[in-house]
């Protein structure tokens, strides 16, 4: 079949030029049914949201009718203007990482299934091809070298038919004789310096005054590396050297932890595991190098489409093989799940490599074995923690932690995952003094990346496990100990920064301690075990507060009105099952009186209408440099952002909502005022009494004010277009733990918005308006106020808290854990769509159950990197493991209607982990200091 496109949607407009290669973006791929006129689906969808609440997900109809097509499903024949011929690629990978690679042999394949091209490291060297710099080198392993990691790519094989590809793959995959290895060597990672090292030191000052020392106040300091281990500065109370002074306070704290008799110190070491994200769809790529048109067409499945979009040209521009490529068209379809597994991966770059050599469109698609071997994993953490309490007051007096993080074989966000994990260790507690060290080391394991939780699952679970044990040692109720130590509004985090807003931790704890399962846990244990002599009963609790955002969020959105009054919303976020299209499409109803008729996700090129550019890393840019660049109204610290870090509900909402607000304030309300003035008021004789925009309200019939007739959106849109008013608003924002704001002059009025870029599109009646090639007019900001670069040292200030109470039974004979019930408390801020929040709670809890009880990958040659792992060996939690019929939750209501929505996609996964570990202790009287706690561990303990 072919894929018809509305021609207006296929006008690929120039985005940017990288090394002479012009990068374009195509709209979201759609099934051919969408091309039918008078599509009944559109009539059904017209009622998808009423009274500002969605009746079903925006993409629900496509889901149930089979029209939601994922990138993995597209073949060349489905793509407009592509040849019908589809080629296929197979990647050969190393399954050993401690022997010299000598070569590979596929001569045993019959001639009719031999690849027509074998791409090796020699081809890369001859054609100057490599990965982008941030992934490191060695795109393909050279002969005579030891693999950098298990699963390293050796060669790419190209086949001209699926039959040949499939037969060849069946004979190559799992065949240990294909790749030859020589002498044994040391693991390559052992000779590399750490990927990153962080040290977070704080010494609180007098109440209400500045800290004696903190990361926010005094800045970060870093070690030297000697024999691949960090060597930190000498300790010295020197005002001239923040590193030495930081070490002075770290040393003081360590001495107190070791020697103070009035402190109780819990000293424990925790180990977490390597985990496979298990996204619904493994990664895939399809690409066609149209040599006649000098254009490379690409279909990717990525959470970070914009990152790939801006970097693909760099790979191509370097290579003489691709010197004829002048254009790259990037298609960004739906992706089947993410969890961080498809954020910032290098998979698509191997697709580009294949496309450069292929004779036709070529597809690379991991099967589940290959995804296990290649895909990003969750970082394993080893944490040696010392948590000190005052024996009398039960208040925390200090925290010392030494974390070692396994960063895998290729660097991928490992530095920031390590930093975020370290900064999250404090959980929901106020800690007056801390020395937290976190070092991320390369290893032979498959590369680890930004999997859901981003380091916080590992560190906060350990903190909660410590609190549960400390409560027992101090002979105090676990929730009471938490209430004593809960961080309160205005208190500082371990970096010395004040978290934004009211944390509401104590409120959540008070709700949990009143739950019947908690109140009756002792009597319930006696009754249950008497009734079930073969089982043990336990209840556990955990509470955490997860940051959301990256400290350099840069969302973009646009909201447009057609002449008929249809609303079109476009965002940079990728829909990967979380319902971003539903929430973003619905939230505009606040200002426009109706939800969106069309929502387009993963938009990239069109946002270049704002003509923005960036220059420096937003994390290390100096204040002087930021001040200098801010004078250019086209400059921003960051142009684009990935769909990650629980970004959509808070960050993406900012630009979507502001675009709708501007459209309402500058177009819809003025248009309505003119109609009311001319038709329903003696405007020539008196001043209207309906000029206060705050009094305007949307009703079912339209926009009304102070008793004047409602005017429907279609009428207002028609007038706006005929009069050449603003009918489309595009916005960009930047957030470094606070929003940038800027002044813009729109329609002659100067106003400050929490944005740093605006562009507008005017209606069909507009005359003599200069627009750029995208049809937009950039509204240059008059001034801008970016958050100070020092806020980078805060590491995080936005938090969303979540608590979970878990009730379990343990079968004595088998060690099997049965979840009887769970209750989750979540403070999500303003809820955009409750059903989507509920889905996150259920899905997050399931993933947490997997981390706590089931999911595990060995970190040596027996693990995922050897290519033999799949769901036949890897246990993910199923419905029977989750207690699905007793999975309950409470959403804390917002403090007011002005509360922002919070990013909760990750936090909902975390507290169930320590809750389950504690429940196992309460059942078995055995504490565990690792995850997962599997049935065999429990049997051994019993």
Question: Language-model features: where?
Answer:
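N-terminal secretory signal peptides
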Residues: 1-11, 32-37
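N-terminal export leaders
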Residues: 9-17, 23
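Flexible, low-hydrophobicity surface segments
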Residues: 34-217
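C-terminal catalytic domains of large/alpha subunits in multi-subunit enzymes
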Residues: 122, 319-326, 357-361, 419-531, ...
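Short acidic, glycine/serine/threonine-rich loops at helix termini
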Residues: 129-133, 168-171, 309-311, 339-345, ...
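Phosphate/diphosphate-binding loops
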Residues: 160, 360-405, 653-679
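Helix-loop-helix junctions that connect adjacent transmembrane helices in secondary transporters/permeases
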Residues: 203-318, 486-564, 790, 804, ...
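Thiamine diphosphate
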Residues: 336-359, 363-367, 373, 382, ...
